[in-house]
């Protein structure tokens, strides 16, 4: 199994495209991470919108550059709104990304996410346990936390990618991005990133935005993982703990965009 690495030139090119196109991202995400997710997108140069009412969600999915479905705080009314948005995104050819939070531990959201797969997401982003559960390989995870190493989920990610046509991202100490054939590994980051709620969910929003960019979508999505890890490393170097990490992280994302514009 060959795992390719992303070059710094590829990452910089994708970030230039990101800043140039400034995708409008319709984030149907969980209540815990909305502010952090929106600020992450803004720091990188995208435009976030958090539209959740069913009628509006369907309408906005046709306007947005990309749609994110994150099931972290799933309810039945929210599931109805998400389904409506995904159906409209499919009709409008709006790329959409699924973040199947905790599907390995909870049956209702697993069934819901499996139903959504019939609408062919452009990308799927989850930890190893979530990706393996969604692929039907195993049930597991400790709520939103993974109990599996990312590398162990590569075969499941490849299978899921081939079956759905999505680019699948497995995040962990090393992130792996695959279209079912090619695999790109992204190293970096810091364990402190797991002590701040929302870094994975925010990455899913950035992945969604990258699905709207021209060029090689696999490389663009892998670049999203690289930006987040790179910003995390910079933020940790300036932080004293989780509380001071978040503002430094947002600053680091902003600085990355300024560097590619220089």
From Swiss-Prot:
It is an enzyme of class 2 (transferase). Pathway: Cofactor biosynthesis; thiamine diphosphate biosynthesis; 4-methyl-5-(2-phosphoethyl)-thiazole from 5-(2-hydroxyethyl)-4-methylthiazole: step 1/1. GO terms for molecular function: ATP binding; hydroxyethylthiazole kinase activity; magnesium ion binding. It comes from the Bacteria. Substrate binds at residues 50, 198. ATP binds at residues 125, 171. Its EC number is 2.7.1.50. Coiled coil: none annotated. It holds the Pfam family HK. Its cofactor is Mg(2+). It catalyses: 5-(2-hydroxyethyl)-4-methylthiazole + ATP = 4-methyl-5-(2-phosphooxyethyl)-thiazole + ADP + H(+). One of its GO terms (biological process) is thiamine diphosphate biosynthetic process. SUPFAM superfamilies: Ribokinase-like. Keywords: ATP-binding, Kinase, Magnesium, Metal-binding, Nucleotide-binding, Thiamine biosynthesis, Transferase. Catalyzes the phosphorylation of the hydroxyl group of 4-methyl-5-beta-hydroxyethylthiazole (THZ). HAMAP family: Thz_kinase (MF_00228). Belongs to the Thz kinase family. This is Hydroxyethylthiazole kinase.
């Amino acid at each position: 199994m060959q795992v390719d690495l992303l070059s710094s030139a590829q990452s910089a090119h994708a970030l230039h495209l990101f800043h140039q196109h400034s995708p409008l991202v319709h984030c149907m995400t969980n209540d815990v991470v909305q502010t952090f997710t929106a600020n992450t997108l803004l720091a990188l140069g995208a435009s976030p919108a958090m539209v959740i009412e069913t009628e509006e969600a369907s309408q906005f999915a046709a306007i947005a550059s990309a749609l994110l479905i994150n099931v972290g705080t799933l309810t039945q009314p929210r599931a109805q709104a998400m389904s409506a948005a995904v159906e409209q995104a499919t009709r409008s050819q709006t790329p959409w990304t699924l973040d199947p939070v905790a599907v390995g531990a909870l049956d209702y959201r697993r069934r819901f996410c499996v139903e959504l797969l019939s609408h062919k997401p452009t990308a799927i982003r989850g930890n190893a346990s979530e990706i393996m559960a969604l692929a039907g390989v195993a049930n597991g995870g400790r709520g939103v936390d993974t109990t599996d190493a990312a590398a162990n989920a590569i075969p499941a990610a490849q299978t899921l990618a081939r079956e759905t046509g999505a680019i699948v991202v497995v995040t962990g100490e090393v992130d792996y991005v695959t279209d079912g054939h090619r695999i790109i590994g992204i190293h970096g980051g810091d364990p402190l990133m797991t002590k701040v709620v929302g870094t994975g969910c925010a990455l899913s929003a950035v992945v969604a935005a990258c699905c709207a960019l021209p060029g090689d979508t696999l490389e663009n999505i892998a670049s999203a993982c690289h930006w987040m890890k790179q910003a995390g490393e910079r933020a940790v170097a300036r932080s004293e703990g989780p509380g001071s990490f978040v503002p430094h992280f947002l600053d680091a994302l902003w600085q990355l965009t300024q560097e590619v514009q220089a």
